[in-house]
Amino acid sequence: MVGVGSRMGWNEAVASGRAMLEGVERIRLPGAELGVELAGLDWGGEGELVVMHHANGFCAATLAPLAVMLRDRFRVVALDARGHGDSTSVKPGPANEGYDWETLALDSERAIAGVFEKTGHDRVALAIGHSFGGALLLRVAERLGPQIERLLLCDPVLLPPLTHEQIAVRSNGAGLAAATRKRRNVFPSLEAAYEHCSTRGLFADFTPEALALYISEGMAEDQTGEATLKCDREVEAAIFDGGAFAAVAEGVGEAAAQVLFVHAERGNFIRAYYEEVAGRMPNASVTGGDFGHLFPLESPATAVEFVDSMFEK
């Protein structure tokens, strides 16, 4: 797998990334409340339904390298969370209102109902959630029961209950939310954004297509060509803040799906906690590998291996 460290140029990378969106239908789906719509990418096809959800701060299009590996077997639809990609964005309230994880999970639940209506499917054969997207889809699986048949959770954001002191440290110290609020979000051009991100450790191992789609689909150009992230830094930070309060795993015993937790051994989450949560579920297991938290964007073929393992059972 070629990473951005190979220095594929912008023109080649964006052309290769956009080719992965050829034939894709851009759809609008209902959110949790009136006036909020989620954007989706529908790769079409006649197979069983696969629904994917991205990590915080990214967008549905970054999962295109994974989608194109599945589209010959499945009907693949990827969702943009509110405030991301082309979904409706609302301003976070003082206590992160609008971006609490219960609301975001309800967005996904309503959007999946919209996918059912659009595609004619009445169940999801496989839901794939990366990071915060995994946490949201776990919550959806608790609510939809047998309508979610399989759930692949790629290093999901699942945290043991935190004290108020721990929450304060996470939210206001050197945590992800604080770092996000300082991150650069405006660039002279899309190409300049690609060149900048290519030098940053966060994106070092992305496939060129995933990074190019993060830039071309996750940023908006103005009339001068200046590019700004569609996901406002305050939105991304509000979601990180809200994760400390999320009771995602409270109702996991209600999830009827076959669930596979994938732990990134070079990530920051706790495998033992995944195993504790899986132990409360009727049909869940935990595996892992020598990769980092962003592995679906770095090695989509690895994610496909986990998909294949779930359909072998």
Segments predicted by a language model, with ranges:
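Conserved serine/cysteine hydrolase catalytic core
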Residues: E209, M219-G279
